C-alpha cells in the first residue's frame, strides 16, 4: 500500500465548506492509518442506512418499531469506536499541526483543530434513546458520528466563518503538511 498526500486548491473546501467535507477528510486519513477504522466505518454507514430505511418504513408499518433496538445496538458498537478513534486522531493532529502552523505564520498564529462530535461515545446510547421519537418523525438518524464536525480555530477565532482567506489557506496548508507527518509515522 502506498500512502499519498495530495495538495490541491480544493483542499480549501475542507476549511470552508460544510461538515461533510471535514468528516470525509477525517475518515480518509483514519482509513489510511487504521485498517480496522475502515471496517468500523463501513459497518457503521451500513447500519445508519438500514436504520434510516427502517425509520421511513415505520410510517407504513409501525410494528417494525421494535426492531430499532437491534439497529441501535449495532450503531453503538461501531459508533463508539469511531468517536474514540476520531478523538485520538484530532489529538494527534493537533500535536503536529500547531507546530507547523506556528512555523508557517512566523509565530503570529496559533491553530487548533476542534473535534465536535454530535454525541460523546459514553452518551451515545442515551442520545439515541432520547432522540428516537424525533428520528421517527424526521425519518432519519439525528445523532452519531455521521453528524460530527471539525472546527479550525486561529487565535480563538473560528476561521470557517470569521477568518480571512489567507488564514483559511494557511490552515489548509498546515493541515496537508500535517497529513504528511502523520502518514509517515
Name these PLM-found stretches:
Residues 1, 21-26, 42-51, 76-80, ...:
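Short charge-dense sequence patches
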Residues 1-21, 25-37, 94-99, 127-133:
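Nucleotide-state sensing region of NTPase/ATPase domains
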Residues 13-14, 20-66, 73:
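Long, charged N-terminal accessory/stalk domains
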Residues 59-185:
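Conserved NTPase motor "head" modules and their coupling/switch loops across ABC/AAA+ ATPases, GTPases
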